[in-house]
């Protein structure tokens, strides 16, 4: 657990934007930590902003949006660099121009590492960051992940993980770490870093004889490709400041309640962060971290209002019906909460309903069982052939899976954007700061 303040910083930096493909809201909060080390990016039209005019398509069906969350550790410099540059670097890859978005994301993550190494300003830099990003077209989502920030898709009220957390104790990750000359002790790389993949962290990338994806810690991402359907409602990308406190399913249900209650997406993010904020700084780090959360609503040809109506009446996840008059619900929820008391924490459901649980913070935020099952959830969403095509470092897998895979291998509209270091002002979309 990092150093904490005597009182949390609950001011939030929030923004929103939309086009005919998707609508998003994002918010970031420093919380109990002594500094803000998160960054994020939101770009509604990646082609228009960062490719040459001849490469830019005016066809809305070919428009690509980009969203990313970068959770820094050991300082904020690498996270800020990532938030400002990853999307630009991805858009400059040859594979991006050829329409191979999956390869562009892989190449772009590694190119970001190289760009930092080649910049004299970062010669002695020791910090690093996670990277959870998504590129969204009208018909498809690409999710790239390095670290333990997470991307979760809401499908008719059910959580579908599109990434898995890269932890050193995972068998596939541990195998790479050991092969590169490192070790895992107490769930940490070389007894130090709690992640097995990250941008930066160059002290773990010093083996010149090894390729970048084979280093003790690598920036090489896993990429999940998802074909969109009418059942897909929204994507949530957030740092572990959220996921350490809430399960993926709980977040999806919370977001869906807010959408059904006609709340703005950035407001749902703010309410979720208030829920996750620890009532004090003695919870062992749970609820004390920086928090950043992006919700991307997938319009699928619908208006924002139609998406709200669909969330209210179809599928699981909504546990009560809402009256037509939204004035019956507390939509703003601006008053201070949570951190001022140790017991009687007020939990806000996504529709503004208040709940006072009996559990303490540690019991309330215990997601051990879900985290244990997360790798298998992601694997179930991918055919074996898709995972076999992933070169470099394998994703989470059992020893049996690893053996069988080894045997198989031997035998065979107007553009709008915001790019925001969390905690600073935004551009291209209205900024909202609340406390």
Curated annotation (Swiss-Prot):
The entry's localization annotation reads: Cytoplasm; Nucleus
What spans are recorded as compositionally biased (Low complexity)? 409-418
Per UniProt, residues of the PPM-type phosphatase domain are: 23-298
Alphabetized UniProt keyword annotations: Cytoplasm, Hydrolase, Magnesium, Manganese, Metal-binding, Nucleus, Protein phosphatase
Q: Which GO terms describe its biological process?
A: negative regulation of protein targeting to mitochondrion
Q: Which reaction does it catalyse?
A: O-phospho-L-seryl-[protein] + H2O = L-seryl-[protein] + phosphate; O-phospho-L-threonyl-[protein] + H2O = L-threonyl-[protein] + phosphate
Amino-acid positions noted as binding Mn(2+) 1 in the UniProt annotation, renumbered to this chain: 71-72
What residues does Mn(2+) 2 bind to? 71, 240, 289
**MF terms in GO:** metal ion binding; protein serine/threonine phosphatase activity
Its top-level enzyme class, in one word, is: hydrolase
Regarding protein family, the annotation reads: Belongs to the PP2C family.
Specify the protein name.
Protein phosphatase 2C homolog 2
For this protein's source organism, the top of the classification is:
Eukaryota, Fungi, Dikarya, Ascomycota, Pezizomycotina
């Amino acid at each position: 657990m990092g150093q904490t303040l005597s009182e949390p910083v609950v001011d939030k930096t929030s923004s929103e934007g939309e086009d005919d493909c998707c609508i998003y809201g994002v918010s970031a909060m420093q919380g109990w930590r002594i500094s803000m080390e998160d960054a994020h990016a939101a770009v509604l039209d990646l082609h228009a902003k960062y490719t040459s005019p001849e490469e830019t398509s005016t066809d809305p069906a070919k428009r690509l949006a980009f969203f990313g969350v970068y959770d820094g550790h050991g300082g904020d410099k690498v996270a800020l660099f990532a938030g400002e540059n990853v999307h630009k670097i991805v858009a400059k890859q040859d594979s991006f121009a050829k329409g191979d978005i999956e390869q562009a994301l892989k190449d772009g993550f590694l190119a970001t590492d190289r760009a930092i190494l080649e910049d004299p300003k970062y010669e002695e830099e020791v910090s690093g960051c996670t990277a959870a990003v998504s590129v969204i077209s009208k018909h498809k989502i690409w999710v790239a992940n390095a670290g333990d920030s997470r991307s979760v898709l809401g499908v008719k009220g059910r959580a579908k993980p599109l990434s898995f957390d890269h932890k050193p104790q995972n068998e596939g990750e541990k195998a790479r770490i050991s092969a590169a000359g490192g070790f895992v002790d107490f769930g940490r790389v070389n007894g130090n870093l709690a992640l097995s993949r990250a941008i930066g962290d160059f002290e773990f990338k010093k083996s010149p004889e090894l390729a970048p994806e084979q280093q003790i810690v690598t920036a090489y991402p896993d990429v999940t490709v998802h074909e969109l359907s009418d059942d897909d409602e929204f994507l949530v990308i957030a740092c572990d400041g959220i996921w350490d406190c809430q399960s993926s399913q709980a977040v999806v249900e919370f977001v869906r309640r807010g959408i059904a209650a006609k709340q703005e997406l950035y407001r749902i993010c703010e309410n979720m962060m208030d829920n996750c904020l620890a009532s004090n700084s003695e919870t062992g780090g749970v609820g004390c971290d920086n928090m950043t959360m992006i919700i991307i609503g997938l319009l699928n040809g619908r208006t924002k209002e139609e998406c709200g109506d669909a969330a209210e009446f179809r599928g699981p996840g909504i546990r009560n019906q809402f009256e037509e008059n939204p004035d019956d619900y507390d939509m703003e929820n601006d008053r201070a909460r949570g951190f001022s008391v140790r017991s009687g924490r007020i939990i806000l459901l996504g529709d503004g309903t208040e709940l006072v649980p009996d559990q303490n913070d540690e019991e309330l935020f215990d997601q051990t069982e879900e985290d244990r099952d997360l790798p298998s959830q992601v694997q179930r969403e991918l055919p074996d052939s898709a995972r076999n095509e992933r070169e470099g470092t394998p994703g989470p897998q059992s020893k049996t899976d690893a053996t069988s895979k080894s045997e198989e291998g031997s035998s065979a509209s107007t553009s709008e954007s915001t790019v925001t270091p969390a905690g600073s002002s935004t551009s291209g979309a209205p900024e909202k700061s609340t406390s």
